[in-house]
């Protein structure tokens, strides 16, 4: 009986995982309306938490191991595992986003952009992927591109101080 309960819990977590999770719509609605930084931070954390759950246990284990490699700076190992993740679960947006992040950290910006595009095709509201893309545009001195992306982030998170500040700075530079 105990094993059955554990299996049900495990299955229910994976059945409600990733960017297709029904809870996300409500969280994004609340995030859009939030004017309280503490509340917005909690909502962002909850969204990331949901995004970080793969649709199957095998992918989840590999994804978690890749995160551990990332945390200790073993980026090549992280990329190797994240490549397995996106091959096993190509609909798992956070797998693509995490690999985009590692490519960014390695300075492989074109590969990062490619994975960001895949992330955004799966989850257009992925503010983390959008923020990464804006950072790349800034590195490439594409202020107009970065401004467009910061506006997109503000459509999702109107209270984002970072996006507001960056957009203001870019607009001041473009004048």
Predicted features, each with a name:
Residues 38-41, 127-128, 157-168:
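Boundary/linker segments of alpha-helical solenoid repeat arrays
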């Amino acid at each position: 009986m105990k094993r059955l309960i554990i299996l049900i819990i495990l299955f229910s977590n994976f059945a409600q995982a990733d960017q297709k999770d029904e809870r996300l719509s409500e969280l994004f609605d609340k995030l859009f309306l939030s004017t309280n930084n503490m509340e917005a931070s909690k909502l962002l954390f909850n969204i990331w938490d949901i995004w970080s759950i793969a649709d199957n246990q095998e992918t989840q284990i590999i994804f978690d191991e890749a995160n551990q490699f990332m945390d200790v700076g073993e980026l090549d190992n992280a990329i190797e595992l994240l490549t397995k993740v996106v091959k096993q679960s190509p609909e798992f947006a956070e797998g693509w986003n995490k690999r985009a992040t590692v490519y960014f950290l390695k300075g492989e910006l074109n590969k990062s952009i490619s994975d960001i595009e895949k992330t955004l095709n799966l989850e257009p509201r992925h503010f983390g992927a959008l923020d990464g893309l804006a950072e790349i545009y800034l590195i490439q001195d594409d202020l107009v591109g970065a401004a467009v992306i910061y506006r997109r982030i503000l459509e999702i998170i109107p209270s984002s101080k970072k996006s507001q500040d960056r957009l203001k700075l870019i607009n001041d530079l473009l004048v």
